[in-house]
């Protein structure tokens, strides 16, 4: 069932314009994702009591320990111990036999007030629409017509494999599963005048933490039959698809016991799986004044709206900001040759006419003061219809 362990496999692509692309995802119990979820749980806890809270919360985890650190200015009174432990419990680390236990882990808190230097230049004595960017930076939004979600198939499938394993674990169907998991999907594509069309799944990799009582053969069989076949459309699988299921052979030690975790280390998993581009700023634990998050959400909103309006089949949108300045410094659009309109003039005019990308307007248009962020912290921030930035705007052009 599993592919060759010596790395030898057929990488030939007979069709002109064909290429392969790979994306990965991680599950809720991956140590970096634990930290993302805790940071966003802290953000949500503040927003529930104080929608104007200024939050920059980082998390570190290792065996038996969680550290919260960062800067928060808020009217809320938060029980950080409870927020952290409830999050770990929800993820599924509820027994020391799993290597991490919400009941017994040590929670350290090193949170300070937001720097007054930042506050005075970003939001103090300003109307909300004129709130400045919380820092300089560049952010990207990407969309492609290859899936209904306007997301790359590679990352869509990688996320769905992890989601499926979590569902089977929580329902008790596969009781040997534990929370830490990683997936990776390679898809063969063909190019079509700048757009990309998925043809087949070339390779699937799944590594998931498990208990001691399950055999390798039984795990591989269950992962193929109950995870992969339930998630990946049959039209993309064929007799040449390669599977690397539990390729290490054993994954009992996982979560923070296996690796240290830190907020913001899965930025490609969080976005487009390597497609498009990334400005480097992470999302989790940050309120809307941090344009790393809010402007990246807005750029995705712009990109998806352009594709859904039929103005292009594939697009990358870049925006940039300076600290304390509300208006973006630049807006750039790249359509890979898939639009009949010019990028610099016509499409940019459409964007400027339909979108106001100041942080104080983004927060209003996308309702970013609501405590919605813990849900975003696993399985990707994009391509999920429950989030406002995934609802295309009806464009006037």
From Swiss-Prot:
Flexible loop: annotated span: 114-126
Any one Gene Ontology molecular-function term assigned to this protein's record: methionine adenosyltransferase activity
EC number of this enzyme: 2.5.1.6
Gene Ontology annotations for the cellular component aspect, listed alphabetically: cytosol; methionine adenosyltransferase complex; nuclear matrix
Keyword annotations: ATP-binding, Disulfide bond, Magnesium, Metal-binding, Nucleotide-binding, One-carbon metabolism, Potassium, S-nitrosylation, Transferase
Tissue: Detected in liver (at protein level). Expressed in liver.
Substitution effect: residue 180 to G: Loss of S-adenosylmethionine synthase activity, but does not abolish polyphosphatase activity
Record-listed Mg(2+) binding positions: 24
ATP-binding among keywords: yes
Binding partners and assembly: Homotetramer (MAT-I); dimer of dimers. Homodimer (MAT-III).
Protein name: S-adenosylmethionine synthase isoform type-1
Source organism of this protein record: Rattus norvegicus (Rat)
